[in-house]
Structures are given as structure tokens and as C-alpha cells.
Amino acid sequence: MKKQWTRRSAAAIAMVTTLLLSSHSFAASENNERVDPRNEAYAKDHADQYDSWRSTSDSVQIEDALAEDPNMVILWAGYGFAKDYNKARGHFYAVDDVRQTLRTGGPTDENSGPMPMACWSCKSPDVGRVIEEQGEDGYFSGKWARLGSEIQNPIGCADCHDTRSEEFKNGGPALALTKPHVERAMDAIGKPFGDQSRLDQQAAVCGQCHVEYYFTGKTKAVKFPWDKGTTVDEMEEYYDEIGFKDWTHKVSKAPMLKAQHPGYETWRDGIHGKNKVTCVDCHMPKVTKEDGTVYTDHKVGNPFDRFEDTCANCHTQSKEMLQSVVATRKAQVLKMKLTAERQIVAAHFEAGAAWDAGATEKEMAPILQDIRHAQWRWDYAIASHGVHMHAPEVALEVLGTAVDKAADARTKLVRLLAKKGITEPVAIPDISTKAAAQKALGMDMEAMKAEKKHFLETVVPEWEEQAKEREARDYEPM
């Protein structure tokens, strides 16, 4: 095992020699100083920001979203999210959580495992460092495990700030996009980062990760599907035109799309986005210490936890009243979410029954397209964290169209099934719990958990040891 990862490290070093040949290299910089991805390196000069960032480690609890809503196991059948899907924790846990999820499997060497390198892209400031050193092709190529020892530090300072700039060193924010695919995405929607206002830049740095994206090309590089715009319809049209699918559904065989977390897109369409109230206004407010010092709180969290520093800056209503409004909107979105899920789950099983009854690809094509569109719209709404607050009207409208699309699919399926001699309702197996739903799909969860356990106990310690040695060699001690 040791030799396998050592060889990979040597190969990564050798690859640096080719970085200037990369067609999308991000290595060019006005400052030749090596970027330091270690968040602790900024603790002394930016103590308040660092201490508040470190407080994101307070979110220790892991909440199992599949256990809460087993429908999602079926909706993602055949895809990694059916294995596990936990609600997001604080930035402090970004690297740990992606290592521990069953979705990344249990690779035993640099070439094994189910996921590409791109899965690190929103987890660490080491990503920007590696892209600078090896170019985009050098970073994205290969499996997720290939550069496991290089991605060590969780989401932090160098993800959103130009930490090498004089502005940052003198206490200024020096906001920056640190990944070239994000710069291209902003250009695509006519918002080059350098031309953006300070408020837009505050949202854009969050939009490096809190967005919809997909993996493209031989290297499975990250791309935002914004060529036609950022609405659910525009991105759907884009995906359809290029014939993209994330996976083929295990039950219905539909060519599926998996929305990631389009928070930036839904925020733009919501009341706050339209009024230039940005992510940091609500989630990272400026706070005043007892000595009068003002700083930006980097403990990204619920605005109601710091009501006087967030909501009360604009709203005259009481905290209790606003909490009631948000709770009502959340309940409305949840109700429509579950309605859409029931329809789409049924459509998947009915499509499976149609295949079993001898349906042809030609007969199924329009049905599968309806299922694809229905679930894309459902996912776009539910994967956008906080959409009930950011843009509840968008969520309800999009979920409504998801129900309509699913109903279209089921109407066509009723006719097709009748044509095949099936007039009784299609039976749906027990999916009342996460375990039952995974069993219905024939998933060997114990084997997956054992594989992950072995990976965490054998491979991850080697990654951490190699990262420690590299950082000791490349950076000044803290």
C-alpha cells in the first residue's frame, strides 16, 4: 500500500514539468509566491476571522438526509447519492466529510474508486494550489484518490481571498476567484469578476461552490452549465442540447441529471438577490467586539442565530415574526417537495414495469424525457440549500413544474402499460425506510461500509502523513 501512494506522489511531482503545456493552466500569476492553503497560517494576522472560521467545527452532528426521506434512495437509484447523503456541516469538515461519504468509495490505490478528481474541487484551498502548480488538466485528470495526499486543508482563507496580495496582508479582504472554471462561468453570464461591484463579488466567491455544475470531457473537469443562463429552464435546455446525463436510472433507465446545490442561481432570482442583499450580509455579518473592533464573522451559519447583526439591519419586524414567516415557507416547500417525490418515484417504477412488459426504446423515449425533466426540477429546488428563504416563490414554481412533468410521464405510462396488457396499478416495494429502499434496489450496504472502513483506516493515514511531510518542506512553520 505504501509504495502505491508513494509512486503516485512521484508521478504528481513529475507532472509539474508539463504545467506550462496545459491549455487551461491557472499557474500564471502576478505574484510568484506560493499560495499557502493552510488556514492556520493566517491565524495570527487575521485572528478574529480565523477564530470564527474555526467555530464552524461546532457543527459536529451528522444528519442523515436519506433516513429522513427514503424516497430519495429511489430517486437516485444507480447513483452515488443512493448510498448516503448527509446534510452539510461547517466548512471545517469539508475534507473529512468527502473522505467519509460512501459516495467516494474505498479506493486502494490512485487508480481505483468510483469518483473523479473533480470531487475535491469545492473542498479545499489546496485545489487552487494544485491547479497553479500542475494546470487544470494536471489537477482534474484521473480518479479522486490520485491526489488524496495533496488535498489536506478544508475550505478556508485561500479559497475566497488573494492571500498573497498586499491588500490581504494589510488587513483588507482581497476577494478572489481561485479556480479558473469559475472565472469562465462568470464570463459566460456577462459578469467578469474584475468588473463586478463589491457586493456582487461577495456573492461570487460563495458562488464558486454553492452552484450547479457538472463534469465534462476526458478529464471530468468541472463546468457550470450557464452558457444559456442560470434558471432551471435555461440549464435544462443546455443539458438537453449537449446530450448530457449524470447517470442512467437503475429502475426506469431514464438519462438523469443530478442537481448539485444551485444556491447562487436561486439567490439571484429571489428577493434578496434582486436587491443586492448577498450571502455575507446574512451568513457572515460584520460584528463589533467590546473594544470596538469590527470584523466579518466567518462562522457561516443561520442568520437567526445573530439576528441583530443580520436581519435587523433591514427588517423592523421581530425575530419571532420573521421566524414564523420562514417556517411557513419552509413547510410549503416541503409539502410540494414530497408531492413531487411521490409522483416521480411512481413514474420510475411504472417505467420499469413498461420495460419488463416489452416496451421499446422508441416508445419509452418521451416518457423518460419527462421523468428526466421532472426529477431535474425537483432536485434543482431541493438541492438549493435554504431555497425556502432565498427564493421560496422559485422553489414552489419549479416544484410545481416537476409535478406536472411527472404527471405527463405517468399519463403516457398508463397508456403504454395498457397497450402491453397491464391495467392494474404497478406495485411499489417497501421503501418506508432508508434500509428498506436500499434493499429494494439490491444494494449491499454492509460491503460498502466495510470497504469505506478499510480505506479510512489504511489509506487516509498515509495521505495525512505525506501531506504533513510536504507542508513541512514547502512552508514556514507556524
Swiss-Prot record:
It is found in: Periplasm. One of its GO terms (biological process) is nitrate assimilation. GO terms for molecular function: calcium ion binding; heme binding; iron ion binding; nitrite reductase (cytochrome, ammonia-forming) activity. Catalyzes the reduction of nitrite to ammonia, consuming six electrons in the process. The gene is nrfA. Keywords: Calcium, Electron transport, Heme, Iron, Metal-binding, Oxidoreductase, Periplasm, Signal, Transport. Heme c 2 binds at residues 157, 160-161, 298. Heme c 3 binds at residues 91, 206, 209-210. It comes from the Bacteria. Substrate binds at residues 213, 261. Transmembrane segments: none annotated. This is Cytochrome c-552. It holds the Pfam family Cytochrom_C552. Residues 1-27 form the signal peptide. Heme c 4 binds at residues 279, 282-283, 390. PROSITE patterns: MULTIHEME_CYTC. Heme binds at residues 119, 122-123. NCBIfam families: cyto_c552_HCOOH (TIGR03152), PRK11125.1 (NF008339). Its EC number is 1.7.2.2. Gene3D superfamilies: Butyryl-CoA Dehydrogenase, subunit A, domain 3, Flavocytochrome C3, Chain A. Its cofactor is Ca(2+); heme c. It catalyses: 6 Fe(III)-[cytochrome c] + NH4(+) + 2 H2O = 6 Fe(II)-[cytochrome c] + nitrite + 8 H(+). GO terms for cellular component: outer membrane-bounded periplasmic space. It is an enzyme of class 1 (oxidoreductase). Pathway: Nitrogen metabolism; nitrate reduction (assimilation). PANTHER family: CYTOCHROME C-552, CYTOCHROME C-552 RESPIRATORY NITRITE REDUCTASE. Disulfide bonds: none annotated.
